[in-house]
Amino acid sequence: PTQKYHDAVRKMGEYEEQYDLVACSGGDGTLDEVVTGMMKREKKVPIGYIPAGTTNDFASSLHISKNMLEAADTVVNGVPFACDVGVFNQDYFVYIAAFGLFTDVSYETKQSMKNVLGHLAYILEGTKRIFNIPSYRIKVTHDGETIEDEFIYGMVTNSRSVGGFKGITGKNVVFDDGKFE
């Protein structure tokens, strides 16, 4: 089990080569760490995901069962499929890379509050940030065009749900097209 930040990345670096599948159970953050650890390995194997977090956005987008036994059965008996992996500052992601307003909420919300209140704990933590909204000077180059301005939020994602909110990125999210929304 993981106990602290980057435990899963470290454990991925320590496991021996004889495995043909890695299964993880946790939230979006745990999956992110496992993916990061896997991408740093020379030999990559499929990752099975059993969602057990607060919002499980990525699992929801993939229609992975919230029932842990059903999800575990899919990990063992399901068919592996490709999934886009993004990289930002040498950190890998499959769910989201973001900056700005509310991006620290999932990290700053106490686990005890998430255990009791679930998604509502994130909303309550987020309300603390409403009156202190910093901006960031960002330069973005995309499709040959460069935009430079002040932004309060930005994200790149491959999910139909972000922070427990569905529909933010639209319905046409494809997980293996080489593009992020």
Label every model-predicted segment.
Residues 1-25, 36-37, 70:
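ATP/NTP phosphate-donor binding region
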Residues 2, 40-156:
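Catalytic core of DAGKc-family lipid kinases
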Residues 24, 32, 156:
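Redox-cofactor binding/interface segments in oxidoreductases and associated redox assembly factors
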Residues 30-42:
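Short Gly/Thr/Asp-enriched flexible loops that form oxyanion-binding sites at enzyme active sites
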Residues 33-35, 59-60, 165-166:
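Short glycine-/acidic-enriched loop or helix-start segments at secondary-structure transitions
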Residues 155-181:
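Internal helical hairpin/lid segments
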